[in-house]
């Protein structure tokens, strides 16, 4: 079954806020999967996630993802995407795009001819969306990070 129309996709946009810093302890060493260690013994300082996630303050937004067209890329319903509107989209970037009155998150691929592009879903239940001069289309921003909750 191919879902060509993604009217069920709903994105919620939030500007990146930079009020009071919220430093979080930073472990001195990287953590190997499966190797337990008393982490508190290895704290080296603090970090603020905005310093890592946000390169262009005025152009960065957080977008809540709704829908499952990108699940095979590890982007799930309810995830939070960090989107930078100042980055020029490149072939292969994951983007928030505006197509014919709808926002969507997809991988952007330009055709070799350069005359049209594709918005590629990462779920075989969905079809790629061809974009060219006949569409109302714009890349709204480039997805730089995705925050995915793994525990409640």
Task: Briefly describe each language-model feature range.
Residues 110-152:
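Glycine- and charge-enriched low-complexity intrinsically disordered segments
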Residues 62-66, 96-98, 108, 118-122:
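Short, acidic/hydrophobic/Gly-rich beta-strand patch recurrent on exposed beta strands
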Residues 82-83, 96:
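Hydrophobic beta-strand signal
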Residues 78-79, 93:
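Structural motif
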Residues 1-71, 102-103, 137-140, 145-152:
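Short, positionally conserved secondary-structure boundary motifs
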Residues 91-115:
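Short, compositionally biased
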């Amino acid at each position: 079954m191919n879902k060509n129309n993604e009217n069920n996709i709903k994105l919620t946009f939030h500007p990146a806020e930079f009020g009071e810093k919220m430093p979080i302890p930073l472990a001195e060493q990287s953590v190997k999967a499966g190797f337990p260690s008393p982490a508190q013994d290895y704290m080296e300082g603090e970090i603020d996630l905005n310093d890592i996630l946000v390169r262009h303050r005025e152009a960065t937004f957080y977008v809540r993802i709704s829908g499952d067209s990108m699940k095979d890329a590890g982007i799930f319903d309810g995830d939070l995407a960090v989107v930078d509107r100042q980055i020029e989209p490149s072939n292969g970037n994951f983007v928030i795009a505006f197509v014919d009155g709808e926002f969507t998150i997809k991988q952007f691929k330009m055709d070799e001819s350069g005359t049209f592009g594709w918005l590629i879903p990462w779920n075989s239940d969905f079809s790629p969306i061809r974009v060219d001069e006949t569409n109302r289309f714009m890349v709204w921003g480039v997805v730089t990070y995705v925050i995915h909750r793994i525990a409640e």
